[in-house]
Design a protein with these regions (language model features):
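Conserved NAD(P)H cofactor-binding loop of Rossmann-fold oxidoreductase domains
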Residues: 81-87
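Rossmann-fold cofactor-recognition segment
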Residues: 45-60
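Residue(s) in the substrate-gating loop at a strand-loop-helix junction
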Residues: 131
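Conserved glycine-rich cofactor-binding loop
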Residues: 10-11
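Short alpha-helical oligomerization interface
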Residues: 89-101
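Active-site loop immediately N-terminal to the catalytic Tyr-X3-Lys motif
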Residues: 136-142
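Active-site helix of classical SDR
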Residues: 111, 147
Length: 153
């Protein structure tokens, strides 16, 4: 049985990847901030999906990841699709700082936790969603571009 954990599965690419993996017979653990959205997706494939409310910006997120891995019975693939980005023409500091917290701090926290899990277990796969903005840059969203560059490095 193949097992994947998807962080950021409450919408967008993460949600769609979850649906595709379910169709392919994977057992998945899904995590995100919106528990109602997690439960809605879980209801589409009873017995195939475990859920965990998790915010990558919280220091306890790696512990919650390990909880989800235990619920699932292991992890073969870690898929990170959490991230934020906003246009910020006035360079409001809070927008830039929130983007950095999620896309750098949260990214680092979760990928490091997944890496350490796989290192201890003898292997696995890590996949993350980034953006062309990390190589091309978007002047209207400076923190988004910078954080995606960080993820691409």
């Amino acid at each position: 049985m193949k097992r994947a954990i998807i962080i950021g599965a409450t919408s967008g690419i993460g949600e769609e990847v979850a649906k595709l993996l379910i169709q392919q017979g994977w057992h998945i653990g899904i995590a995100g901030r919106r528990e109602e959205a997690l439960e809605k997706l879980q209801a589409t494939a009873p017995g195939q999906i475990e859920i965990q409310r998790l915010d990558v910006t919280d220091p306890d997120a790696p512990t919650l990841l390990e909880t989800l891995i235990r619920k699932l019975g292991g992890m073969d693939l870690f898929f990170l699709s959490s991230g934020i980005g906003s246009q910020n023409p006035d360079l409001k500091p809070e927008i830039e700082l929130n983007t950095a917290r999620t896309n750098v701090e949260g990214f680092t926290r979760m990928v490091t936790a997944a890496f350490n899990h796989f290192k201890n277990e003898g292997g696995g796969h890590i996949a993350v969603i980034s953006s062309i903005a990390g190589t091309k840059g978007l002047g209207i969203a400076p923190a988004y571009s910078a954080t995606k560059r960080f993820q691409n490095t």
